[in-house]
């Protein structure tokens, strides 16, 4: 294989070289173009690991609009719910760029859990992280004010980074989808934050100048 997916995904980081080699033997590598849907309600259950490129995972609202759940990069994975026989009624994973992905079938993965039980614990940890992120997103969307959604999002990035300068991990259009608004509204809000001397922005890098006043701006 050109890529060792076990070397980049946190799910397998605690395994020894022999165990990783055994897993690599079960994976199938694919080169896929931008805009390829890799997981949908109609696809067979499999674990999908990103070896190169970026993916987006989203669900469709009743009006057909995408609600972005997360952007996946190298080392991230999707599809674990289907491996545990949990139905997928409305979740899609699609490539944002040309990408290299590795897949493991549900049958092979279930056998893997029996042979390498420590993966189960790591799977629980990683899934808890994903659930926490979804709960945080629900908190953003639960507020009617885009000021609150965007400022709290930026302040949460600051907390996670442990510093005032943060990098938004997705395109601004994707962030708008993630926060349930439009790119124009995000742009206007960022401009207001800059005019109020609360942030400085260069591309996707944002420096938070006054976190306390940003909290006040949110309200």
From Swiss-Prot:
The organism's place on the tree of life at top rank: Bacteria
DNA bind region: 191-210
GO cellular component: cytosol
Bridged cysteine pairs (disulfide): none
One function term, GO molecular function aspect: DNA binding
Occurrences of domain HTH crp-type (ranges): 144-212
Record-given protein name: Probable transcriptional regulator flp
């Amino acid at each position: 294989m050109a890529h060792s997916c076990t070397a980049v995904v946190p799910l397998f980081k605690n395994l020894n070289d022999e165990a990783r080699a055994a897993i690599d033997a079960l994976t199938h590598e694919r080169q896929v173009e931008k805009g390829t849907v890799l997981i949908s309600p109609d696809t067979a259950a499999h674990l999908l690991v990103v070896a190169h490129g970026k993916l987006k995972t989203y669900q469709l609202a009743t009006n057909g609009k995408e609600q972005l759940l997360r952007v996946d990069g190298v080392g991230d994975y999707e599809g674990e719910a289907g491996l545990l026989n949990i139905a997928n009624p409305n979740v899609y994973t699609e490539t944002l760029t040309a990408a290299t992905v590795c897949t493991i079938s549900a049958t092979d993965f279930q056998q893997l859990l029996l042979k390498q039980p420590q993966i189960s614990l790591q799977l629980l940890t990683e899934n808890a992280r994903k659930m926490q992120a979804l709960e945080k997103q629900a908190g953003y969307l639960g507020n009617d004010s885009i000021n609150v959604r965007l400022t709290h999002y930026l302040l949460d990035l600051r907390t996670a980074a442990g510093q005032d300068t943060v990098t938004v991990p997705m395109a601004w259009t994707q962030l708008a989808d993630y926060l349930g608004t439009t790119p124009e509204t995000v742009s206007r809000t960022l401009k207001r934050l800059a005019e109020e001397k609360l942030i400085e922005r260069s591309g996707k890098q944002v420096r938070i100048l006054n976190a306390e006043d940003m909290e006040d701006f949110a309200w």
